[in-house]
Design a protein with these regions (language model features):
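Surface-exposed, interaction-prone regions used to assemble/regulate multi-protein complexes
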Residues: 1-121
Length: 121
C-alpha cells in the first residue's frame, strides 16, 4: 500500500475519472479503525484498461458500510467522491463536495489517513 496525501487527491481521482461506472468489489473491516474498500475501475494512464484499486482508510472516524451482497447493486454511474475536508479523508458514492454531503451517501468512509494499491482486474 502506498500513502495518498491530500495534495495528490485531485490527480488521483482524475486518473480514474472519479470512479464513474466502477464496480465495488469488497469492503473489508481489518480492525475497528481500519477499513479496506476495493473497486474495479478504468485507468486513464493505461488507455482506460480496467484495474483493481484498493483504498485503505486508517483512523476511521465514521462510516456507513453495506453488506457484500449489496455492493453489486450500488449505482456508480455518477462515480464517487474522494475528498479532503476538515483534516480528514472522505469517500462517498456520487458527487460530494464536503463531509456533510458525503454522509448522505449510501456508502461512505471518513478517516484520518489513506493508502492505495493497484492490482490486476
Amino acid at each position: 500500500m502506498k500513502p495518498l496525501s491530500h495534495t495528490q487527491l485531485s490527480t488521483f481521482t482524475k486518473r480514474f475519472d472519479n470512479f464513474k461506472d466502477a464496480e465495488l468489489r469488497s469492503v473489508e473491516i481489518i480492525s475497528p479503525l481500519t477499513i479496506k474498500l476495493t473497486l474495479a475501475t478504468q485507468d486513464s494512464t493505461r488507455a482506460y484498461d480496467w484495474i483493481t484499486v484498493s483504498l485503505e482508510f486508517n483512523g476511521v472516524q465514521d462510516a456507513r458500510l453495506l453488506e457484500e451482497s449489496q455492493l453489486s447493486y450500488v449505482d456508480m454511474s455518477q462515480g464517487a467522491s474522494l475528498i479532503y475536508d476538515e483534516n480528514l479523508f472522505a469517500f462517498g458514492i456520487s458527487e460530494c463536495y464536503n463531509i456533510s454531503s458525503i454522509k448522505n451517501s449510501s456508502l461512505y468512509l471518513i478517516a484520518e489517513s489513506l493508502k492505495y494499491e493497484e492490482g490486476q482486474f
